[in-house]
Amino acid sequence: MGNLFARKRRSRVTEQDKAVLQLKQQRDKLKQYQKKITLQLQRERELAKQLLHDGKKEKAKLLLKKKRYQEQLLEKTDNQISNLEKMVDDIEFAQIEMKVIEGLKVGNEWLKKMHEVMSIEEVEKIMEETQEGIEYQRQIDEMLSGSLTAEDEEAILEELEAITQEDLELPEAPSEPLSDTVPEKQAVKNRPKPQLVAAS
């Protein structure tokens, strides 16, 4: 049942494609005919050679006349094949040109729609506003960079010098190791107390 409701696919084969196919088929038939005539000419030449060898000169001459006629046909076949191939190339190139033209047409339509949405005046306005924004930001940057006076610069240098001096005035750490001796007062505290002895 699915086939009953399925949409019929559109054939992608164009009239130009059919024409190219027919031309190529005719070309292939001519090439087959050309191959057949070429083989026949080779056989007839060998046969004429044999007739001359057998002393049948008139028959050989008649056969060579036929061969000459077939060679002329072969030459015409070459020209026809060349014409067919040229026509195939022309049609295929014309198809490419048509696709290019269709692409250009679609592109032009989109450009027109874009131009309708955005006019030249709007573009100029946007560019002008963008330039104004850039100029405004530049002025802000200049104000920020030029806001420090000479006094401010001097105060910054003085503060930098003061911080440097603080680092220089810090006491140095002792370079020798500390001794393990107990201070004298601590030694006195640790002495044993004298004990009183009762008189006898």
From Swiss-Prot:
Location relative to the cell: Endomembrane system; Late endosome membrane
Lipid-conjugated positions (N-myristoyl glycine): G2
Record InterPro entries: Snf7_fam
GO biological process terms, semicolon-separated: late endosome to vacuole transport via multivesicular body sorting pathway; protein transport; vesicle budding from membrane
Annotated motif Type-2 MIT-interacting motif, positions: 168-179
Disulfide topology: none
GO cellular component, one term: ESCRT III complex
Alphabetical keyword list: Coiled coil, Endosome, Lipoprotein, Membrane, Myristate, Protein transport, Transport
Topology within the bilayer: Lipid-anchor
Region named Disordered: 165-200
Subunit structure: Probable core component of the endosomal sorting required for transport complex III (ESCRT-III). ESCRT-III components are thought to multimerize to form a flat lattice on the perimeter membrane of the endosome.
Similarity remark: Belongs to the SNF7 family.
Protein name, UniProt field: Charged multivesicular body protein 6-B
Origin species: Xenopus laevis
